[in-house]
Amino acid sequence: YKPDTKKRIALFSHWDSRPWADADPDAKKHYTPILGANDGASGVGVLLEIARHLQKQLPEMGIDIVFVDAEDYGTHQAYNGPHKEEYWGLGSQYWARNPHVQGYNARFGILLDMVGGKNAEFRYESLSHEVAPNVNEKVWKTANALGFGRYFVQKKGGFVTDDHTFIN
C-alpha cells in the first residue's frame, strides 16, 4: 500500500502449514500433514481483511503485506540429525536476505501467526519484547483500548522461533 511512501510498516504471515503432524499424540498421524486453519491460514485471513480495509481508510504511511512460505517446515521429530533453528522460517529467511525493494527498511513489523485459535491469548514474545518493546506496548495498549484486552495479556511469554526471528 502506497509503495512510494518512505515511512513504512510491514505486516507478515506465513501461508504454509506443517507438512507432518509429528507432535500429535496419535503416532499413526506423525506423517500426515497439519490442516493449518489456525497455524498458517488465520494470519493470512487477517492480513487479507486488513488489505480490504486499507482501501477505505487510507492511512498516511505505506504498508507492506508480506506472505512467506515454509515457516513450519523444520525437521521431523523422528529425524536423527541436528534440529537447527535455521531449518524453520525458510521463506522469511529468504525475504530477509532478498527484500522486495533493495535497501528496504520498515519502521517496524508485525507478524500474525496462530491468531485464530479458540480463546487465543497473546503475551509479549521474548525476542519481540527485547527488540521492539515500544511496538509491543502500542499493540497491546491499542488492543486493550478497543476492548480486546482479555486476548492481549500484558505479560511476558517465552521465546518462539518463528518468521520474526529471521526478519529482526
Where are the regions that the model predicts?
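Structural element of the ATP-grasp superfamily
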Residues: 47, 139, 166-167
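Acidic, glycine-rich loop-and-strand cores that form catalytic or ligand-binding grooves
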Residues: 131-151
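Soluble metallo-hydrolase cores and metallopeptidase-like ectodomains found primarily
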Residues: 1-33, 52, 56
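Solvent-exposed loop/turn segments at secondary-structure junctions
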Residues: 2-5, 15-19, 70-74, 114-119, ...
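Surface-exposed patches in mature extracellular/periplasmic domains of secreted proteins
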Residues: 58-64, 150-157
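Acidic/histidine-rich catalytic neighborhood of metal-dependent amide-processing enzymes
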Residues: 31-134, 163
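Zn-dependent metallopeptidase/amidohydrolase metal-coordination segment
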Residues: 154-168
